[in-house]
Structures are given as C-alpha cells and as structure tokens.
C-alpha cells in the first residue's frame, strides 16, 4: 500500500531539522499546496497570517504566552478583568496527576499546549486516559511547525461546562490594529461543523472558510457590543489576531486567543470571499 500524501507530509515534518529555515520551508509548501499560488506581500487574509507565521512576530513573547490556555487567562484578567475568564477547576501537570485527580461529573478537559483537542465529560462518564496520555506526548509544533507552540509545557486544564452546555456557539472575532473587524461563528462543532461570517453590525456575509456555510440562522447576541469591546481591548496588544468568545447573551467569556488562524492554509468558499474578508479587516484603519 502506498503511503498517503498526508503520511509523507508528517514523515517530512519529523525528518526536517527543527529550525526557522525549515519551519518556513514547511509553511511555504503548505501555503502553495493549499492556495495554488505563492504568498504575496498584499493585505490578504492568508498572506498576512503567513507573514506572521514566517517572521519573528510568531515568536513575540506575548503571542507565545497567550498560546498557553492556562496563561492566556492571566492576560485576559489583566486587560479586561477576570470575569471574562472561564473558571479554572484544576491544572494537571502529568499523567500521574491525571490518574490521581477526581474529575467533576460534568466538566471540560483540554490540553493547554495544543489546539482543537477537548473532552466534554457528562454524568460521570469514564475519562479516556489514553487520549489524555497522547496529549502529554504531543507537541503542536510538530504537527505544522507553528513555532509559538514549540516550547509550551504539556498540561491539562479542567473547566466547568460553561452556560451548562456542551454545544456552545463559538464567536471568533478577528481584530486588526486594536479594532474588531470581522466575526466568524462556528456552530455544531462536535456534530456537523459549519460556519457563518458577519460584519460587526451583524450583517451576514456571502462566504465561508474551510467548513460549509451554515444554513440555520444565528441570532445576534444581545451583548454584541460588549463582545466587540472585549475583543478589541485584547486585540489592541497585537497587530492581527483572533479572539474567541462564548456568551449567553449576558456574560462574555474568552475561550482563547489565536495567533495564526488555520495555519494560513484554510480556503474560502467562494474564492472571492478572501478579497471581501480582507477588505473588511485590513481595508480601513
């Protein structure tokens, strides 16, 4: 059986030396493969992300600091207040800690040093210790050479299921020069992932990114103005960044801060969506 391109890519990642030259080579090949074009110096969505990833900006100490899902809460507390943080129940530093720990019957369990990994525990269901053990053995840098993850310490954070829900809507707000510019809404992430995009006045936009455009309506949050203020305050410490929020219409909680959305390889549907999104984000100061 011939190995897949994905398998060959992972082998190449393991074999290439871990340095910035090879990191940038991987970024270039990944960008070329995803977008079928060379990266440019233009203010286009993925090109700006590519430049963040391939320059010293991705290693800015603050960007590295907020990549850790435990430490980002210290930043959020300092900038917008601890009331915007999801409460922390526990932080576990080893599998020994995990095996000794009595997990709450309902909780959210996730690694602080990875992305896209989460276990939602309900009604005291058994916790998958093998999956958590894999987290401790994983380094997200080795997946796609995002250098801000390279030296993060493996940990697991335990949080409550906020708003008593395991199917929250993610509001991802793209900020540029300290202002909220574009809103991405992720729905049914753990069922049938789909997305919608809105401007800051909650007008729906005619494109999606990576996932299908959601068909079901998404109501404007009652506290949208507060959400935009929180995102802008946090985003003011970066050039271009994504601030992820959860809300029940009253409270506004920060999920994470993302430096390089989609590793700069997610594609728009239709293709013209990238120019529209880019003009909304970068086209005005």
Where are these regions (language model features)?
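Membrane-proximal basic amphipathic "stem/tether" segments
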Residues: 1-60
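A conserved helix-loop-beta module that forms one wall/lid of the active-site cleft
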Residues: 43-122, 138-147
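C-terminal active-site "lid" helix and adjoining low-complexity regulatory extension at the edge
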Residues: 45, 247-285
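Short catalytic/ligand-binding loop motif for oxyanion handling, primarily in non-cytosolic enzymes
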Residues: 73, 96-99, 115-120, 128, ...
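Short, flexible loop/turn elements at secondary-structure junctions
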Residues: 92, 113, 162, 175-177, ...
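Generic beta-strand structural signal
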Residues: 102, 175-176, 247
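Phosphate-binding site of ATP-dependent enzymes
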Residues: 130-211
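A long amphipathic alpha-helix within ATP-dependent nucleotide-binding catalytic cores
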Residues: 151-155, 195-254
């Amino acid at each position: 059986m011939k190995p897949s391109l994905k398998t060959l890519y992972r082998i190449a990642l393991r074999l290439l030396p871990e340095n910035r030259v090879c990191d940038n080579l991987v970024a270039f090949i990944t960008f070329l493969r995803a977008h079928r074009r060379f990266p440019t110096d233009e203010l286009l969505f993925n090109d700006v992300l590519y430049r963040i990833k391939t320059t010293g900006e991705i290693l800015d100490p603050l960007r590295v600091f907020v990549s850790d899902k435990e430490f980002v809460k210290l930043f959020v507390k300092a900038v917008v207040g601890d009331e915007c943080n999801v409460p922390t129940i526990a932080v576990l530093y080893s599998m020994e800690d995990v095996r000794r720990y009595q997990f709450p019957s309902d909780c959210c369990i996730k690694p602080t040093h990875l992305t896209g990994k989460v276990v939602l525990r309900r009604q005291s269901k058994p916790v998958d210790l093998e999956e958590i053990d894999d987290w401790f053995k994983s380094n997200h840098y080795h997946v796609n050479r995002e250098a801000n993850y390279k030296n993060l310490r493996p940990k697991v954070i335990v949080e409550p299921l906020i708003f008593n829900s395991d199917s929250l809507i993610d509001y991802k707000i793209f900020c540029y020069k300290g202002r909220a510019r574009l809103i991405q809404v992720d729905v049914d992430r753990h069922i049938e992932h789909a997305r919608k995009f809105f401007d800051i006045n909650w007008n729906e936009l005619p494109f999606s990114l990576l996932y299908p455009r959601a068909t079901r309506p998404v109501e404007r949050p009652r506290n949208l103005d507060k959400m935009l203020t929180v995102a802008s305050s946090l985003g003011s410490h970066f050039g271009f960044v994504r601030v992820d929020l959860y809300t029940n219409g009253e409270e506004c909680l920060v999920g994470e801060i993302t430096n390089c959305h989609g590793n700069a390889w997610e594609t728009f549907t239709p293709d013209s969506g990238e120019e529209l999104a880019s003009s909304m984000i970068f086209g005005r100061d």
